[in-house]
Amino acid sequence: MPQSTSEPADTTTRDGAAGARPPSPLARLGRLLLHDRVALLILLLVVLVAWMKMLDRGGYLLGPYDAAYMAAALESFVPLCILALAEMLVILSGRGGIDLSVGAMVSLTGMAFGFMVGEWGWPLWPSLAAALAFGTALGAVNGFLVAVLGFPSLIATLATGYAYSSLALVSNDNAPISSRPVQDLHGLTSMIDLPFGLPPVPKQFFTFLLPCAVLVWLLVNRTAFGRRLYAVGTNETAARYAALSVGGVRFRAFALAGLLSGVAAVVTVGQFASARPDAGTVGNGMALPAITIAVLGGVAITGGVGRVGGVIVAALLVVWLNAGILLYFEGSAGSRYQLLALGVLLIASTLLNAVAGRGRRRRAR
């Protein structure tokens, strides 16, 4: 019987791969943290809290960094997180989408809400609905400039941000609206007690932020619009070939950002018990921290990549970090170092997004 002269196939690569040593637990953890932004942020959050606790016990802080202080810091967490979700929607739409006007929309919508409740005597619920519609209209102006007229979003929203800020200032001669009906809105954002001995938290965490987060998650993960939003942001050319309305998707993203800015405006009016014309632009403003939080949360600045969970945890990290900085430095030095921390976080998150993006492209080949 003739013997076969064929040689066994070269299995070096296959056998080498099969016989390769499995990655160590540390390597697997590093890979998880690189590709799962939520896991990385949770780890950083734990490290931050542990570090601040150590500084607290060592007497290096101006006050206690305890559960009550961290819960009180959620008051600034709510509007910032809502605006970061607004930025997520805009950035997801691609083509360098960004909205620099969200802080100005908070100021102008808050003033409009203050007029409705405090000056014109409107009931709360119609005023609330009108304020949200007003914020949506402001966002729609941005969407028209970007999606219809083709303006770069950076230029369009910078211009409208200037305009909205100016209108907020001149609407009441640069004075806040602090009449009794507006002051009564502070009840919307009062602290509420939690069971099991937990420290009280701001009411707006449950009444405003959680509904917004759930609705945005459902929008981007469970609707046709969400699928189109990711498709347009990932590859605009392919989306056009698939007959998707790229301009329509981008327009709606900016309009929804205006809607969320309106929600944040209502929250700030309640927090301050006053409609302030500089509520979203005073100091460091709200726009740049919101953008930083979105990028830190894993939203790719090129579009098409981002998760609601990452944005929420990133907002918590930024707020608790800022709260710790204020306890470490005396006087106004704390606010200046907050800017430094935001800059470092933005650079680090951009680098992480770039590395994660290269990993996704390698796996797609």
Language-model-derived ranges and their functions:
Residues M52-K53, A67-W120, V146-L149, T292-V308, ...:
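Single transmembrane alpha-helix segments in multi-pass membrane proteins
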Residues R276-G343:
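Transmembrane alpha-helical segments in multi-pass inner-membrane proteins
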Residues S153-R222, R252, F272-G283, F329-G331, ...:
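Transmembrane helix-bundle core of multi-pass membrane transporters
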Residues G58-A68, D173-A175, P200, V220, ...:
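Inter-helical junctions in multi-pass inner-membrane proteins, predominant
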Residues P2-M54, T234-T237, Y241, S245-G248, ...:
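Cytosolic-side transmembrane-helix boundaries in multi-pass membrane proteins
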Residues W122-P123, L138-N142, F196-R276:
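Helix-loop-helix "hairpin" substructures at the membrane interface of multi-pass membrane proteins
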Residues S76-M88, A104-L108, A140, A159-Y162, ...:
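Hydrophobic alpha-helical segments embedded in the membrane of multi-pass proteins
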Residues G121-G161, V313-L317:
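Alpha-helical transmembrane segments within multi-pass membrane transporters and channels
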